[in-house]
Structure formats: C-alpha cells, structure tokens
Design a protein with these regions (language model features):
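Alpha-helical protein-protein interaction elements
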Residues: 1-2, 16, 29, 61, ...
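Local sequence-structure signature of Cys/Sec-based thiol-disulfide redox active-site neighborhoods
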Residues: 2-27, 32-37
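Thiol/selenol-based redox catalytic cores and closely related redox-interacting motifs
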Residues: 39-119
Length: 119
C-alpha cells in the first residue's frame, strides 16, 4: 500500500503573507498540516531537509529584515551550517510561508509560487 504524505505548511499566524498564503491554498481546497514553527521549533535535521527540498542555501532562506539578522549576522562570513544554527536558535529568521508537498517545497512569496508544487 502506497503511503500518502500530507502537505505541510510552515506558518506564522502573525505574518500577513503567511495568512494570505494559507487562504490561497484553502481557496484551492488544499488543507495542509499547519506547522507553527515559532511555537513548535523545527529540528536541525528537518531544517536541512527543508533546504534540500527548497533547493536553496541557508543564506537564501534567512530573513534579512529581522533585527536578529542585522545585529548578529549581516556582514559576517558565516557558513551554511552556522546560518542553520542561527535559524534553529531564532526561528523567526526562517523565511515564510513554506509549503512542502512530499519531496518538493516552495516559499510562498508570492503565494502563487505554491502552484508549482500543487498542480
């Protein structure tokens, strides 16, 4: 019997773009498992797996507008692993929203990016 994976949505309810992305998916009758990653912290292994599914580096996933980034990371030559560690410690540094569909993932900026992995 084939195992069916449910889509996962890395969500921050306080973020307008994240709420808009979820509403967009629901308008397409897609109801993913919602992961409030600020409350239920993502593990390092899961974040590394997410980077692979997104096909991006940690530097590409990090939110550069956050004060934590500006005060601690900007201008430093940090490795991918060091940036992952920062995102684990400070999950608000992780760009959002993210939809995962099996082995594929997309950042919903713009929300229409999700169409690449749901159609």
């Amino acid at each position: 019997m084939e195992k069916q994976n449910k889509m996962k949505y890395y969500h921050n309810n306080r973020c307008r773009k994240s709420r808009e992305g979820l509403a967009f998916l629901e308008s397409k009758n897609i109801h993913p498992e919602i992961i409030n990653y600020l409350e239920n912290r993502i593990s390092k292994d899961d974040l590394i797996d997410l980077l692979k599914k997104l096909n991006v580096t940690a530097a590409e996933l990090i939110r550069k507008s956050e004060s934590v980034y500006k005060e601690n990371i900007r201008g430093k030559n940090l490795s991918n692993d060091q940036l992952v560690d920062w995102m684990i410690r400070e999950p608000k540094l992780i760009e959002r929203p993210i939809l995962v569909n099996n082995e594929l993932a997309e950042i919903g900026r713009p929300k229409e990016n999700f169409l690449k992995i749901i159609t």
